[in-house]
Curated annotation (Swiss-Prot):
It is found in: Cytoplasm. GO terms for biological process: nucleobase-containing small molecule interconversion; pyrimidine nucleotide metabolic process. Disulfide bonds: none annotated. This is Cytidylate kinase. It comes from Vibrio vulnificus (strain CMCP6). HAMAP family: Cytidyl_kinase_type1 (MF_00238). Belongs to the cytidylate kinase family. Type 1 subfamily. It comes from the Bacteria. Its EC number is 2.7.4.25.
Amino acid sequence: MSSQTPVVTVDGPSGAGKGTLCMLLSKKLGFQLLDSGAIYRVLALAAIHHGVDTESEDALVPLATHLDVQFVAEGDLVKVILEGEDVSKELRKEETGMAASKVAALPRVREALLRRQRAFEAAPGLVADGRDMGTVVFPNAKAKIFLDASAEERAHRRLKQLQDKGLDVRFDDLLSEIQERDDRDRNRPVAPLRPAEDALVLDSTSMSIDEVVEKALQYIESKLAE
């Protein structure tokens, strides 16, 4: 990793608002963007497409090594291209998310994708969105943020998103899924979900996105000036 390229990492649990924050930060700073969670979803989706067991390291490592994925920014969105196909919508399905969390718990698969993630570091800078960006992937990042929110608040946000799409879902089911994913991510043996020791921890439970962006930018600008 080059010490010359400024890297901003944003870690945190699912539904805390990392994607929105990272998109806005990358636009305001003019930096490249990496959605590491999408990479795991892409691998999980590739496994599903190719009939590969999402819990088999032996089968997943070769797939991860040769994963053909691109991130293409368009307007306020980042299109994810897998093997030439836009899979952005398919990546957001609950089935894909649960499979991705299983994939991310496998040590050799994480190792295979680590080099791919680090290759996104390029001038003028990078905003990296994930769960272990500041602790594992970019431990020397100039600025590290851990964005959190209560499980209940994250379930409410997800409920609204799905209802806005016309889907019939239950709050209790979403809350249980989020709590199960949190437990799996926080207690996995490799790269468990936790703030880096030198990270700014932001709890977005009662904050607007504008407030989160403002606090994050103040912190980032102070770190980049050091």
